Amino acid sequence: MTDVTIAVPVSVRFFAAAQHVAGTPAAELMLGPGATIADAIAELCGQSDEIALVLQKCSYLCDGVAVRDLRASLRPHQTLDVLPPFAGG
């Protein structure tokens, strides 16, 4: 039997300062099986030191639900929203 590795495609949407440092409003990640939200963030942080600094301060939504545990597993085709701190009214 062959070992089949299935990638986990995840959509990422960046907002405000996160979008600015990412240089794009959205990105697609291909993560390994069993990938967690922390793995997705680590993949994004690897793109630049600047984005890594911003992502440390962000909150995250996964399919519209606030992320409380970065160790939560991602399923294929989920959407991760990256929300930096907002100010104003």
Spans of features found by a protein language model:
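Ubiquitin-like/PB1-type beta-grasp interaction modules and other compact soluble beta-rich domains
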Residues: M1-G88
